Amino acid sequence: LVHPLACLPEPALESPTQGSIPDDAACMALWDKYGMLDNIRAHSRMVAHIATELAQRARAAGFPVNVAAVRASAMLHDIAKTYSVLHGGSHAQLGASWVVAETRNHALAQGVLLHVHWPWAVPEQEPERLFSIPFFVIYADKRVKHDQCVPLRQRYEDLLVRYGHTEKARKGIRLSWQQGECIERAFEAHLGYAIHEDSFDSGRLVQRA
């Protein structure tokens, strides 16, 4: 399986310098504007929670991470999911275009565009690229089953049961799983502790919801 973007040059991964960074209230206003279903909102909150926790830890470890930008991109990563469920199309591509239109912030949109799969090699030995918006959002999304934080294995075993009806589908799911494990190992190596079974204090978020 070859991702259609894989033949293109890798993008620059920089902290946002132009456009706005919407806070939670502004992100939720966009959820309303684009008619996001309640279950996708709950999923997005958990993805944003995990991405934010990871971004804060990376920043505390000395990496130059814009935590607010990571959170906003994670909150908006599935902004077009409801539309795509109803009408088809790539929710990542459409969502990225909406985020550019609404915020003029291409770094946030990059996280939305690439949250399903990073089509190039994961920069395991380049922490300045690894600790960027797309990888926080990709990994956080892979750790959430519906609206619960779970280990990668639990998430992907569920996906294989629900969607692995063909060999092509199973191959795609396994490739995504492998990429999640690669990002996880790289995060662990640079942060200096294990995150593969970390709940990121997600119970606190569930209690507040």
Task: Kindly give the residue locations of the regions a language model identified.
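Divalent metal-dependent phosphate-bond-processing catalytic cores, especially two-metal-ion Mg2+/Mn2+ enzymes
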Residues: 1-18, 33-63, 76, 120-209
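Acidic-glycine-rich active-site phosphate/pyrophosphate-binding loop
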Residues: 17-25, 70
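A short small-residue
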Residues: 25-34
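Alpha-helix N-cap/N′ positions at the starts of helices
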Residues: 26, 90-91, 135
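His-Asp-centered metal-binding catalytic motifs of divalent-metal-dependent phosphohydrolases/nucleases
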Residues: 47, 65-99, 110-119
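Post-HExxH zinc-binding segment in Zn-dependent metallohydrolases
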Residues: 102-106
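A structural motif
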Residues: 107-108, 148
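Boundary/linker segments of alpha-helical solenoid repeat arrays
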Residues: 108-109, 167
